[in-house]
Amino acid sequence: MKVLSQFVNINNSKQNILTMITSNENPVLLIVHGGPGSPDRPLVFKYNSELSKKYTVVCWDQRGSGLSYSKDDKKKELTIELMLSDLKELVVFLLKKYNKDKLYIAGHSWGAYLGLRFVSEYPQYVKYYVGTGQGISSYVDEIYKFNFVLERAKELKDIKALEKLKSFGAPIGASYSENSEYEAGYVGKLIHKYGGYIHPKSTLSMNSYFLDYIRFYKLDIFKVLAGMNYSVKNLNPQINSSDRITDITELKVPILLISGEWDYICPVPAAKVWFEKLSAPKKEFAVIKNAAHMVNFEKPDEWNKELLKIL
């Protein structure tokens, strides 16, 4: 396996891609990371490099993220539309570079939102779409999140959390603006605490996660951290004010969704409701047990197996 790192000029922005390749004959798999602003190449390299036997695996540090982060980025407004445009330019570049008509896209979390929107708009470039931790609607997801932490707090007899949750109650209405008392940040902390981000039985942990990043990026870790802050600050308000993918009811390419059974960052029940109504040439929803939002790194053997099955 060859590992290549290079900068590509995308929409007048130098963006870095890491490629794991064994043969130019293999189909291209573009990994679209989550966050926003959280490049995943250290974990993909560690846990998913097996895929390079059958795919040319490309990890993209998105605009404002990882090695692609630059202070010059602040001169241009960071929008979801710009990120989609970047993704299109990168896809066209990769297809030309590897002489392919189409490629595979695997998006995780925020990357699954970006990836699915891209596939919906530009199906002519995509052979197969894989969404891991597929968020549906920021607001609808929040209802499932609240119910999850409330039930877990009861199971674990977490009295302090129960009192806090009951003090502001479940989200109601149709948007965050109608719920000024609701504390999404607190609910998010409980999801982490209760195993909805990384499952308690997983060999992956937050400590090992961060150590992998430091070992991989070395001194560039400071650039990575700056990019995370920049991307979250600029993109999260746009993401949270949208319905994400609820308007997508039909795809022209096959789709595979993969979720950890315990994922409540992007709740599995919400994804299933949307998925059942989706029309696509072929569709499959794989749920992996004893895993949560980071299922692609918590249960890499099972996740990799799903990716290899669609070839």
What are the residue ranges of the model-derived segments?
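The serine-hydrolase catalytic nucleophile loop
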Residues: 36-48
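Conserved alpha/beta-hydrolase
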Residues: 51-70
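Conserved acidic catalytic loop of the alpha/beta-hydrolase fold
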Residues: 82-102, 117
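Conserved hydrolase catalytic core segment
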Residues: 100-143
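A catalytic-pocket lid/entrance helix-loop region that shapes and gates access to the active site
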Residues: 126-172
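Alpha/beta-hydrolase
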Residues: 159-246, 253
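Short beta-strand/loop motif that positions the catalytic acidic residue
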Residues: 251, 257-259, 263
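Catalytic histidine-centered segment of alpha/beta-hydrolase-like enzymes
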Residues: 291-300, 304
